[in-house]
Curated annotation (Swiss-Prot):
Keyword Signal attached: yes
Gene Ontology annotations of biological process type: defense response to fungus; killing of cells of another organism
Record's signal peptide: 1-27
Cellular compartments per GO CC: extracellular region
Source organism superkingdom: Eukaryota
Pfam families, per database record: Defensin
Designated name of the protein: Defensin-like protein 51
InterPro entries xref list: Defensin-like_dom
Keywords, alphabetical: Antimicrobial, Disulfide bond, Fungicide, Plant defense, Secreted, Signal
Length: 80
């Protein structure tokens, strides 16, 4: 019983330490400024104009939408 108590105690302490540590694991793309627009996040069928606009609004921009930055690259979410 003593070994089990110690094992459970160490497990719970480890869980507490891991859960209380700050985790900044969210990856973000480098923002590029193109013609006065802040462009980031590649647009897809899931990440469309609406979600791009919502992200721009939550970042403090008045609006945003998906733009083709160059013909050889995919559309990017650009805030303006």
């Amino acid at each position: 019983m003593g070994f089990t108590k110690i094992l459970v105690t160490f497990f719970l302490v480890g869980l507490l330490v891991i859960s209380s540590s700050p985790q900044n694991a969210i990856a973000s793309e480098i923002k590029a400024k193109i013609n006065g627009l802040e462009c980031f996040n590649t647009c897809t069928s899931y990440y469309d104009d609406h979600k791009c606009n919502v992200d721009c609004l939550s970042s403090g921009y008045p609006a945003g939408e998906c733009y083709t930055v160059s013909p050889s690259q995919p559309k990017k979410c650009c805030c303006y």
